Amino acid sequence: MTGTVASTAYLLAMLLDMRLTGNRYDDRILWGGYLTDDRTLQKTLGTAIHTSLGIVLAGAYGMAAPFLPKLPGPWRGLLFAEGENTLLFPLVPLMSALHPEVRRGGLPRLGTVEFFLLEAVRHAIYGLVLGTLWRDRE
């Protein structure tokens, strides 16, 4: 449940930052775009994939939590989520080169500073929510 709630918070933050900044970096299209070129289906499948990945990441947080610095829950979640984002970001240029929606122009090029900063903010929301909710389990 924790991963689902944190993933939902991430998606809500994404929708808000897209509206406020006008950027087109949509994680639903990012994940769903690998499977279909139908925009509605991309968003549906992308939401399911994104939520599933958030649940898996929450499980990884649960395994890593005893080894993380002894900080308040929200800060530990933030540290974990930003660590994951930073460690995996070097793979993003490969994703960008291979992604059908980037090639079609449906998504902007990934791997840019703008994309990293947006992902950092979105992951911060995910991590803060994850750490806040997980705190009761420690």
Task: Cite the ranges covered by each PLM segment.
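Short amphipathic, positively biased membrane-proximal segments
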Residues: 1-138
